[in-house]
């Protein structure tokens, strides 16, 4: 038994390694890219649209409203990034129904990469909204003495994003293994259902936290 898919090495040459996390991550990206191309290839801008497009527009509208309720004034600017985070995490967790599949979100390297993308995106959005000088001034608010504390806070919340997602996914897997040894017939079915629900919740929480951080960086001063 291994704790993370990082430990499953599929190919190695010197210091170069290809582990299961990398393979599943790229497979998910190809799945999402291919699915997006298939779903959007027949979208219409006319008055008459298909039921499928109508459902997609409802979902996008709901996401748009959710982002605006968090505090972002121009949700359409941030929707692609936030939606990409949610779709990747949600799809990674939903695919656990496939036998033998191990979600990359159970790897700290993947969750750290997702958190790093948020860490980079937040100042970029902030600078785009209020200029470089205006954004940097926020680190000295409300007084300059808060500068080191604000910098540390920026770093620690990024670490918290990565560890929170990794810990929640890892704990779910460990509980499933424990219950499987107790009752191999009943508990696995219930835990798989609960695991799917938990995976969706974790994707939602991660996306909402990213939205909150972006809203804080782009708020009007």
Swiss-Prot record:
GO terms for biological process: proton motive force-driven plasma membrane ATP synthesis. The keyword Ion transport applies. It is found in: Cell inner membrane. GO terms for cellular component: plasma membrane; proton-transporting ATP synthase complex. Keywords: ATP synthesis, Cell inner membrane, Cell membrane, CF(0), Hydrogen ion transport, Ion transport, Membrane, Transmembrane, Transmembrane helix, Transport. GO terms for molecular function: proton-transporting ATP synthase activity, rotational mechanism. The chain crosses the membrane at residues 20-40, 78-98, 108-128, 174-194, 196-216. It holds the Pfam family ATP-synt_A. CDD domains: ATP-synt_Fo_a_6. Its main location: membrane. It is a multi-pass membrane protein. Key component of the proton channel; it plays a direct role in the translocation of protons across the membrane. F-type ATPases have 2 components, CF(1) - the catalytic core - and CF(0) - the membrane proton channel. CF(1) has five subunits: alpha(3), beta(3), gamma(1), delta(1), epsilon(1). CF(0) has four main subunits: a, b, b' and c. Belongs to the ATPase A chain family. This is ATP synthase subunit a 1. The gene is atpB1.
């Amino acid at each position: 038994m291994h704790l993370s898919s990082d430990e499953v090495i599929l190919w190695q040459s010197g210091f170069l390694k290809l582990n299961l996390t990398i393979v599943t991550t790229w497979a998910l990206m190809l799945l999402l890219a291919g699915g997006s191309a298939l779903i959007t290839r027949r979208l219409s801008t006319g008055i008459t649209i298909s039921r499928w497009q109508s459902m997609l527009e409802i979902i996008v509208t709901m996401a748009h409203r959710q982002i605006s309720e968090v505090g972002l004034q121009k949700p359409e600017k941030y929707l692609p990034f936030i939606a990409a985070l949610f779709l990747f995490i949600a799809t990674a967790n939903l695919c656990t129904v496939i036998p033998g599949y191990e979600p990359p979100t159970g790897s700290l390297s993947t969750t750290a990469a997702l958190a790093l993308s948020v860490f980079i995106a937040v100042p970029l959005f902030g600078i785009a909204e209020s200029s470089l000088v205006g954004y940097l001034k926020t680190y000295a608010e409300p007084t300059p003495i808060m500068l080191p504390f604000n910098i540390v806070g920026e770093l620690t919340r990024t670490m918290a994003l990565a560890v929170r997602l990794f810990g929640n996914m890892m704990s779910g897997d460990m509980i499933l293994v424990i219950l499987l040894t107790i009752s191999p017939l009943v508990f696995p079915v219930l835990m798989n259902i609960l695991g799917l629900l938990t995976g969706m919740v974790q994707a939602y929480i991660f996306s909402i936290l990213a939205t909150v951080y972006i809203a804080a960086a782009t708020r009007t001063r």
